[in-house]
From Swiss-Prot:
Inactivation phenotype: Cells lacking this gene show a white phenotype and produce 4-hydroxy-2,2'-bipyrrole-5-carbaldehyde (HBC), 4- methoxy-2,2'-bipyrrole-5-carbaldehyde (MBC) and a dihydro form of MAP (H2MAP).
One GO term (biological process): antibiotic biosynthetic process
The organism of origin for this protein: Serratia sp. (strain ATCC 39006) (Prodigiosinella confusarubida)
Disulfides per UniProt: none
Any one Gene Ontology cellular component term annotated for this protein: membrane
Subcellular location: Membrane
Gene that this sequence comes from: pigB
GO molecular function term, any single one: oxidoreductase activity
Lineage: Bacteria, Pseudomonadati, Pseudomonadota, Gammaproteobacteria, Enterobacterales
Protein name: Oxidoreductase PigB
Length: 670
């Protein structure tokens, strides 16, 4: 601001000087220029300016003085004034350079100052604002009665936990009597959505890997009427590259395009190049590009990842199963190596089978992209294993993601709607569990509903809630299983929804924000990893407002036991600064922001670290105990909707097998 104010004073003085011909006789200067410019392509314009020198003198004086005042006051639209100054300088350099050659040096100094001021403008933090929301958001209480139906005394299956896992498990039963117990007011766990003027927006999970024929996900979507309702990000994904990170990696970019020369024939590539250098000059923080334009840079990594496609035989499935094409030895080999070492420290790798050997050299830009992709899932590139890391990179970086209106909340809503029409299933919210007591003929489950005590008898139980408190309810679990559960990591993540007075980026899914690490900001450990567009997800809403969703995951190494639980307003202001920078980069002022809501999900995402899949941590943790079976992300070790659905289906199949065995025993005894 010191330089900006200094030049603001100089502009004001220059404007005042136009009133004193003894300092600068503008009409005479313009007449001299008109003579010197004869025969040039701009001669006519120069002659016109010379003929109206007195008016031009007054106009220029007012403009210079006014722009100086603007530089001093520094309103939000100062950027436009600086661009106007640059345009005026360019015009007068063209007109005067022959008759007054010293103008090139003088205006060159002012142009450099203008570019410096532009950089400051694009990186300025907005003044703190107050917003209607002043605390972390919570799921909207259900408008329904607490009782979805009168409860019976006995059930074939009781499911504890009404998140995506529990609801999926319930949907697998067609004849058995099923009761789903949920402690909160709404079902869906971390897969929910809210609305803003009819526009659905996610409050937790957003997207999932594109399902392929025969997959559990596609079968579930078909069951609940959502097959074909999702949108793919294949052609609509943007990447927000930090400008100076991209500039530092220019050599890597050039090499990538030299290896893929056909891309040099695309006008969009040259447009991206121009955008990079322009943004580097004027200081815009991001270079925004379609994801496909980065393909040459990531070509070596993509070629390697294509060997592990979900549609092929060598996909690194989670959980690992012995009937897959990955041998246990190969899985254990990669699960005991960090992804960072595997991809970016080739000198530390021992001998690897040829099909598992990664590219010999991957650049810094690729490293940042890989790190950002995994960080969105609360995974640290140094902590996650190569096996688990490959699973995510194949699906989330190389593959296509799909989403529904409101994100994964549409899946939970679809499951609830489906189950509400199943006469064998009862959904019960507002439940507080008080006891789980195994008995000779099943298990007695005691709980309260809005403070009123109830109990039911269950032949089989599916525990679809997180396993963190299992020791309290099931102290008889084997010590090995309890130890495995204790070793499972759960990480915090935050999600911010920014409500706008008009739609923004509605043509795009949004995308990753690839930036270097910075510890200067107070919440650098909770920075935005993606900026997603609710209007694109819910494109049938046809509303005149917008919502941008910022995923703000945390990793254990960055978080270092810090939390924003009691610092909502500070985190909200940091989020405001983040989204204002994104909007300013695309030419939109922060005044379009109406509110910022933030959702805090403590211990909301399961992560798998080096060695845990090889050691069988999650396999041990999910082992059935007597008539109790387990379903949740922590049964798989992957924090996404696919693992929640898979674990729900697996638990339901285990229950069906147990019930069938019980029926067979009864028939034999009879």
């Amino acid at each position: 601001m010191i330089i900006q104010r200094l030049f603001g004073i100089l502009y004001m003085l220059a404007g005042l000087a136009k009133a004193f011909p003894q300092f600068e006789n503008v009409p005479a200067v313009l007449r001299q220029a008109a003579i010197a410019n004869q025969g040039t392509w701009y001669a006519a314009a120069s002659i016109w300016l010379g003929a109206h020198g007195d008016v031009i003198n007054i106009l220029v004086g007012v403009v210079l003085f006014g722009s100086g005042v603007i530089l001093m006051l520094n309103p939000l639209w100062t950027t436009l004034v600086i661009y106007a100054q640059l345009l005026m300088m360019a015009v007068f350099v063209v007109i005067l350079h022959q008759s007054q050659p010293q103008v090139m040096l003088l205006d060159g100094v002012f142009a450099l100052a203008a570019l410096y001021m532009l950089r400051g403008q694009y990186h300025r933090k907005p003044k703190p604002r107050t917003f209607p929301t002043t605390s972390f958001s919570l799921p909207t209480p259900s408008s329904e009665s607490s009782f979805s139906a009168p409860l019976g005394d006995e059930y074939d299956v009781v499911i504890i936990g009404g998140g995506a896992s529990g609801l999926t498990a319930a949907s697998e039963f067609t004849h058995e009597r099923v009761l789903v117990l949920e402690k909160s007011s709404t079902f869906g766990g971390n897969a929910r959505y809210h609305t803003f003027n009819r526009l659905k927006h996610p409050t937790a999970g957003v997207c999932f890997q594109e399902p392929f024929p025969g997959s559990n996900m596609l079968r579930l979507l078909k069951k609940i009427g959502l097959e074909g309702k999702y949108k793919s990000n294949e052609k609509d994904t943007l990447v927000f590259f930090d400008t100076f990170l991209l500039l530092k990696c220019l050599g890597e970019i050039v090499v990538g395009f030299i290896k893929q020369p056909r891309y040099l024939l695309k006008l969009s590539v040259w447009g991206l190049t121009s955008q990079l250098f322009l943004h580097a000059i004027i200081g815009k923080p991001y270079v925004v590009a379609a994801k496909q334009l980065g393909d040459p840079i990531f070509a070596d990594l993509y070629t390697f990842l294509d060997k592990f496609s979900p549609r092929g035989d060598f996909y690194p499935r989670l959980p690992w199963t012995p009937n897959g094409s990955w041998s246990k030895a190969h899985m254990e080999l990669l699960d005991n190596i960090s992804l960072y070492t595997y991809l970016f420290e080739p000198d530390k790798l021992g001998r690897l089978p040829e099909q598992l050997r990664p590219p010999a050299r991957l650049g810094k830009l690729v490293e940042n992209a890989v790190s950002t992709t995994l960080r969105v899932e609360c995974l640290d590139i140094h902590d996650v294993s190569a096996y688990v890391g490959l699973h995510f990179l194949v699906g989330y970086l190389r593959g296509n993601l799909v989403t529904l209106p409101g994100g994964n909340g549409s899946i939970s809503a679809g499951l609830c709607k489906y189950l509400s029409h199943q006469r064998n299933v009862t959904l019960q919210n507002h439940v507080q569990l008080t006891a789980v007591e195994p008995q000779h003929n099943g298990t007695c489950i005691q709980f309260t509903i809005n403070g009123q005590p109830r109990q039911v008898q269950a032949q089989q139980i599916i525990w679809a809630a997180p396993k963190t408190q299992l020791a309290t309810w099931l102290p008889g679990l084997p010590a090995k299983q309890l130890a495995a559960i204790k070793n499972i990591r759960h990480e915090d993540y935050y999600l911010a929804n920014v409500f706008l007075s008009k739609p923004v980026l509605g043509h795009s899914f949004g995308g990753y924000m690839i930036e270097p690490d910075s510890n200067k900001d107070p919440f650098s450990w909770c920075k935005a990893g993606t900026c997603l567009v609710a209007n694109w997800m819910d494109d049938h809403a046809d509303v005149d407002v917008g919502v941008l969703t910022l995923l703000k995951p945390t990793t254990r190494s960055e978080r270092q036991d810090r939390t924003a639980q009691n610092a909502f307003l500070a985190l909200q202001q940091q989020t405001y600064a983040e989204i204002a920078k994104v909007l300013r980069n695309i030419g939109i002022g922060a005044e379009v922001i109406e509110d910022i809501q933030i959702w805090y999900w403590p211990a909301g995402l399961v992560t798998s670290v080096v060695g845990q899949q090889a050691e069988g941590v999650f396999e041990t943790a999910r082992q059935s105990f007597e008539n109790i079976h387990f379903a949740n992300q922590d049964s798989v070790g992957v924090g996404n909707i696919e693992s929640a659905i898979l674990s729900g289906i697996d638990a339901a199949n285990a229950v069906k097998a147990q019930l069938m065995d019980t029926e067979n025993v009864v028939e034999v005894a009879g």
